[in-house]
Swiss-Prot record:
InterPro entries: Peptide_deformylase, Peptide_deformylase_sf. It comes from Levilactobacillus brevis (strain ATCC 367 / BCRC 12310 / CIP 105137 / JCM 1170 / LMG 11437 / NCIMB 947 / NCTC 947) (Lactobacillus brevis). This is Peptide deformylase. It comes from the Bacteria. The lineage of its organism: Bacteria, Bacillati, Bacillota, Bacilli, Lactobacillales. It catalyses: N-terminal N-formyl-L-methionyl-[peptide] + H2O = N-terminal L-methionyl-[peptide] + formate. GO terms for molecular function: metal ion binding; peptide deformylase activity.
Amino acid sequence: MFLMKDIVRDGDPVLRQEAADVTFPLSEEDQQLAKDLMEYLVVSQDPEQCKKYGLRAGVGLAAPQVGVSKKMASVLVPPVEEDGKSPFTDVIINPVIISESVQAGALTEGEGCLSVDKDVPGFVPRHDRITLRYYDVNGEKHQVRLKNYPAIVCQHEIDHLHGTLFYDHINKDQPFSRDDDMIMIE
């Protein structure tokens, strides 16, 4: 399992590189990477386990964040409905956003990142809805439509695979500026 000491921090060149495509079938090393990326998220979202291991809670973790420049990320969006089901959970491999809404969305509290230790205030404008194509750990192709928070989480993780950090999207002169029609997500 990855610990906070394994998370690459802002300033490391791997976070600014274009990650390499992953080949199938997955090597044993890539299978273990996928398992470890998801395990971090599962453990970090359990308050007792999070405290026990000294983790920061996360909803996404990309391979470059653990020093591996490959197009792989885990996403575990916590349940928001009473049914207890996550709106999106998977290891996304070689993900591509194939369509996106014109409508922008942003988190009211801004975004954070396990690789960025400092608070970077400001709205991070993203597409409110996306259609995502990716492969899972078995090499099966998926195409899903996501909106609001799950869409934002996936865009954040995909940015990591292309050498972009969330604060690159923040307006440097007016970090809290936004279009009137931007959807603000709690």
